[in-house]
Amino acid sequence: MSLPARLPPTLRALLPVALLVLAAVLLAACSRDAARDSRGLTPPPELEDGVLRIGSDIPYPPFESYAAGSGTLTGIDADLARALAEQLGVEVQFVDIDAEGRIPALEDGRVDAIMSAMTITEARRQLIDFIPYFKGGTGILVPGGNPTGIRVDYHLCLHTVAVQEGTLQLDQLKALNTSLCAGGVNVRIKTFTQHGQAVAELRAGGADAVVTDYAAALNDVRLSDGSLEVIDFQMLPVTYGIGVRKGSGELKAALTDALATLMKDGRYDDILYSWGARAGIWKEVLS
């Protein structure tokens, strides 16, 4: 390439460097566009930095927990989040937030979305938007052999029940105390910041039962060597959702499209099957 003779010597010396920088920028942009086009999806403005930040209450197996001996986050939510990020052509970053802090973290922008076995409720719908992705219910976890004979939800009356703070299950216990367990036969509720603490209280004899997501209860039983069991009853079947900020329509649409693709190509089913959660597969039409 010939340069005009009238360019100052300094500019003539810098121009080749500038052209190299420009070429590198254009090449990187083309590479990103090619990667995005290959998936048919383009990340929304919220993900312009190339990172999808997911808020999760860790640990809460089988949805999110660290693999033994490593710092790798695994579980239904973790694996789905990685697959969604891959579909969108971005990286994923997990942010550990307790159950009560999930929505505030989303609202103030610390995370882009919540994937944390979060049930969709009317109260939460007033604050954030949801993309449904899993169905389940509340399980009742008891010691092996079920010594107290708890079989249904109203059998929890007069019993001590451990539950995690900031969860639908705590709301369910409070509702029992104003309905089936009202009038002096209330459930004695013990709250804990982590699910594992509630289970430890049950093991130590400080509680007669734990109420938690049914999938989590099944996972606790699987790891208990017979010392725990879940009763054959689910309280209030519910739907879990990916939480996004109100007004983030482009991000919601992008995640919805990405999830629909995972459902169509089988990756969604594969993830749930791998965690023994086939009963939670969401087959409704996404909207």
Where are these regions (language model features)?
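Periplasmic-binding protein-like
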Residues: I58, K135-V142, R222-A260, A277-S287
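A ligand-binding cleft/hinge motif common to bilobed small-molecule-binding domains
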Residues: G101-P104, M118-R125, K174-A175, R203-L236
